[in-house]
Amino acid sequence: MSDINAARLPSFFFPVPCISDDIEMVLTRGESLC
C-alpha cells in the first residue's frame, strides 16, 4: 500500500511513507492502512 501511494506522490509522501500513506488513504479513499 505504501509503495502505491509513494509512487503516486513521491514529492510529498516519500520521507514519511507510513504516516503520509495513512493521511493519503484517509483523504483519498477514506480508509487508513499503515
Swiss-Prot record:
Coiled coil: none annotated. Keywords: Toxin. InterPro entries: Amanitin/phalloidin. GO terms for molecular function: toxin activity. Processed by the macrocyclase-peptidase enzyme POPB to yield a cyclic decapeptide. POPB first removes 10 residues from the N-terminus. Conformational trapping of the remaining peptide forces the enzyme to release this intermediate rather than proceed to macrocyclization. The enzyme rebinds the remaining peptide in a different conformation and catalyzes macrocyclization of the N-terminal 7 residues. There is a cross-link at residues 11-17 (Cyclopeptide (Ser-Pro)). Residues 1-10, 18-34 form a propeptide. Belongs to the MSDIN fungal toxin family. Cyclic heptapeptide that belongs to the MSDIN-like toxin family responsible for a large number of food poisoning cases and deaths. Cycloaminide E is structurally related to other cycloamanides that are non-toxic to mammals but show immunosuppressive activity. This is Cycloamanide E proprotein. It comes from Amanita phalloides. The lineage of its organism: Eukaryota, Fungi, Dikarya, Basidiomycota, Agaricomycotina.
